[in-house]
A protein has these predicted regions:
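Bacterial carbohydrate/catabolite-sensing allosteric modules
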Residues: 1, 10, 15, 42-43, ...
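Short, well-structured alpha-helical segments in soluble
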Residues: 102-116, 223-235
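Active-site-adjacent beta->alpha loops and helix N-cap segments on the catalytic face
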Residues: 127-136
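Short beta->alpha connector loops
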Residues: 65, 98-102, 122-127, 246
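Short, Asp-centered acidic motifs that coordinate Mg2+ and/or phosphate
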Residues: 117-119, 239
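N-terminal helix-turn-helix DNA-binding module of bacterial transcription factors
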Residues: 1-54
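Amphipathic helical "hinge" segments at domain boundaries
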Residues: 43-107, 117, 200
Length: 247
């Protein structure tokens, strides 16, 4: 485990300067503070504060998902996490993020400088900058409907997309439908890719023809349907499977 002195030696600065950078002191430059934080993360440093039992701060980073109203998809996900955290005496901060935010702030550095012990990431896309950084993160992290290989610090939870889509195809097949369209969600999403694969597999398993005109990526919003349903109907679809509830 790296020490403050190790960081100081790496950067060629004093121990007190490193301490100021780690603790957010105002009498060093933003550039030097960022350099200290980035180096601390690179060297695997953990502050004493983050190792203390009483420091129990978690972050929920959320992107591409509404969560503030009870009717929105992310509401119960965020609420459930916060309720369970509260029962175990954890403080939770919900932080909406954007692609620009991820480019401006390195994940581990942001966690370290804000004293977070772990995080729950919801709604992220496969090509997001932080998803790349999570391959090497040392911070305890849980992903919702996403997956990072070969990093024991990153776990995930999610739905069984294969079983769900297969059940939908099977239900429509038993009702006599043969031309089943699939309006998927956003491209570059792990769940979209899995649901697309599940659709293809289930159609083949039921002996149904796959028509590429009946399979499209849209977006996880209600307006997505109006752009594609007319095309589906024109191609002879008698049933449509949607990638999520909003569509």
């Amino acid at each position: 485990m790296a020490t403050i002195k190790d960081i100081a030696n790496r950067l060629g600065v004093s121990v007190s300067t490193v301490s100021k950078g780690l603790n957010g002191a105002s009498d060093i430059s933003d550039e030097l503070r960022q350099m200290v934080l980035d180096t601390a993360v690179e060297m695997g440093y953990a502050t004493k504060r983050s190792k203390k039992v009483e420091n129990r701060k978690l972050a929920i980073f959320i992107e591409n998902m509404d969560y503030e109203a009870a009717t929105q998809f992310g509401y119960e996900i965020v609420l459930g996490f916060k309720q369970n955290a509260f029962r175990h005496n954890w403080d939770v901060t919900v932080i909406p993020v954007t692609p620009a935010f991820q480019l401006a702030e390195k994940y581990d550095t942001y966690m370290l400088k804000n004293g977070f012990c772990g995080a729950f990431l919801v709604g992220f896309a496969l090509h997001d900058e932080w998803m790349k950084q999570l391959e090497q993160t040392t911070m305890p992290t849980v992903l919702f409907d996403n997956y990072i290989k070969k990093n024991p610090n990153v776990a995930y939870i999610g739905t069984d997309n294969y079983e769900g889509i297969d059940a939908a195809v099977d239900h429509l097949y038993t009702l006599g439908h043969k031309k089943i369209a699939f309006l998927n969600g956003s491209l570059h999403s792990m769940v979209s890719e899995q649901r697309q694969e599940a659709y293809y597999n289930s159609m083949k398993a039921h002996g149904l023809e796959i028509n590429e005109d009946l399979t499209v990526y849209g977006y996880y919003v209600a307006d997505s349907a109006k752009y594609h349903v007319p095309t589906f109907l024109g191609a002879g679809a008698t049933a449509i499977i949607c990638g999520n509830d909003l569509i």
